[in-house]
């Protein structure tokens, strides 16, 4: 397609969505309150309508109608309200909702939090303009996620297996290496390659990453961009960056723009998309700021009462759809304020998502990477993504036994601090030995170490051989007979 044809297609796409009503312009700003602009004497304002605000110096900002009361309209300005002059600001009501241009050309590009290119490249030639709230997916047409994604990280693959189409957050805290873990998952993620069985859609053309950053510092944005460039996957990555010095309110639309792009890539281009959203805590704080400006009744810790619903509108945009080959797997990252898992943000997130990966400060302080604490971590869809034909028949039993031994080992460690090592039984000493080796050999691994799920399971068996057969009560006798002997090579 040459440039002229492309331009013609672009014009057709725009005119297809053209709203025929005349656009009305007002100069009736009656007040500015935080990120909100209040307009009077507006004829038929519509909820969620997009408004273009032209400032006295000629700059144009966009906003969205949040509230309508008679002829009054409350507009949330995405780029912030600094410099808006009540007398000289022109407000044009577009009569349309917020749509974003989408195209396969978005891969390899960098956008700001409002979806404008910031990589000095040309604007996107839109294949379509999609509503950023997403298409409602009929629950009946959703497919249960059943293909395991191999991340190459033992603590995730064996203990908290992720299925393609799952939403699973990383619960972290300030100063912990959650970005490194997310980058490692992006680098290494792929389907499990079973011996003697080829994976049809495993080729890299079929895989895309959509990365949305909200309120992150320049260092984090640079880290991810550099990591994608270094491992050669940048042409399959679409970045949306709202940095810490960008407007707070923009953070409310950034994840929605990213997910709209992901839905297009997954359901129209049939790609398998991995969506990384960081940092959801910044998003929730932006939500609180808007809520406070609207003088709504606050909920827990000042967050709005509808935060649960709002977070669900983001997290639920993951999964698989009948008749389409693509999928969306979501890994939101959130930093728990003061390492508090009962804080409203991680608390509500845990209710919506299908498990969580818990990054632990104590493990990090002991120089263990990745510091994933497997006890509070969970993957609710693991049971259907593992087992014979998908990974290996001993997978769930090994996982259960490792959990049990690690939990008992933690109890023994706490007891040892009280009564001393001399008072422990021989069995207790075995659990202590297991605890140390589990953290050192199983959880701990290199930044670029990509273990297959079979290698990880074999490491698990090496650790379980610390115990005599009789103590491994979670594993059936048939599995023990096959895998427990030292000379078994599977």
From Swiss-Prot:
Name the Gene Ontology biological process terms.
ATP metabolic process; proton transmembrane transport; vacuolar acidification
Q: Explain what the UniProt record notes about the effect of disrupting the gene for this protein.
A: RNAi-mediated knockdown in the wing results in planar cell polarity (PCP) defects including misorientation of hairs, multiple wing hairs and defective venation.
Annotated GO molecular function terms are: ATP binding; proton-transporting ATPase activity, rotational mechanism
Please describe the organ and tissue distribution of this protein's expression. Answer: Expressed in Malpighian tubules, rectum, antennal palps and oviduct.
GO cellular component terms attached to this protein's record: brush border; cytosol; early endosome; perinuclear region of cytoplasm; plasma membrane; plasma membrane proton-transporting V-type ATPase complex; vacuolar proton-transporting V-type ATPase, V1 domain
What range does the record give for the signal peptide?
A: none
InterPro entries for the chain:
ATP-synt_VA_C, ATPase_a/bsu_AS, ATPase_F1/V1/A1_a/bsu_N, ATPase_F1/V1/A1_a/bsu_nucl-bd, ATPase_V1-cplx_bsu, P-loop_NTPase, V-ATPase_su_B/beta
- Pfam families, per database record: ATP-synt_ab, ATP-synt_ab_N, ATP-synt_VA_C
By its UniProt entry, which CDD domains does this protein fall under?
ATP-synt_V_A-type_beta_C, ATP-synt_V_A-type_beta_N, V_A-ATPase_B
Q: Which residues bind ATP?
A: 380
In its keyword annotation, does this UniProt entry include DNA repair?
A: no
Hey, which family's this protein in? Belongs to the ATPase alpha/beta chains family.
* Role: Non-catalytic subunit of the V1 complex of vacuolar(H+)-ATPase (V-ATPase), a multisubunit enzyme composed of a peripheral complex (V1) that hydrolyzes ATP and a membrane integral complex (V0) that translocates protons. V-ATPase is responsible for acidifying and maintaining the pH of intracellular compartments and in some cell types, is targeted to the plasma membrane, where it is responsible for acidifying the extracellular environment. Essential for the proper assembly and activity of V-ATPase.
Annotated protein name in UniProt: V-type proton ATPase subunit B
Q: Which gene encodes it?
A: Vha55
